[in-house]
Amino acid sequence: MRRSLWMVAIALGLIAAWSIGRVQAQGDKVTFADPNHVTFTAMPNAPKTGVTSATLWGDPNEGATGTYTKFAPGWDAGWHTHTADVWIVGIKGAYLYKDEAGEKRVGPGDFLRVPGGHKHWSGGDKKEGALFYTESSGKFDLVPAK
């Protein structure tokens, strides 16, 4: 019985390690990026004006990904959800966030995790907009809330 429990624990550990590696999809190469020296383009699966991104690793159309994202000053994403979990770290300006619990201003160095399916509003600071790093655990999407 004790040996079986150890085997189950080892199997679960291996599955967890594989899953984390798969979600991050970064392989074994070091990734370095400077937001001042990347090319920003229209963000896949998002409104075409006011938001741009630079993919650092992964593919936002296929699965897990890491990007630099910019919101124009005053940009409004409206109320929406994402299918996958999203992690955000502020770099410059402020990513504005709102949900039923209240409002947050995600500035340089601040961290925010938005679980997949969680209804929220987001936008850019009215004067500076926002530059932030985003990781998504799956294909990136922006689903307008009903």
Where are these regions (language model features)?
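A short, N-terminal "cap"/entry segment at the start of jelly-roll beta-barrel domains
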Residues: A16-W18, V23-T65, K146
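Short acidic-glycine-tyrosine-enriched beta hairpin
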Residues: E100-G117
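Ligand-binding loop in jelly-roll beta-barrel domains
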Residues: G116-F140
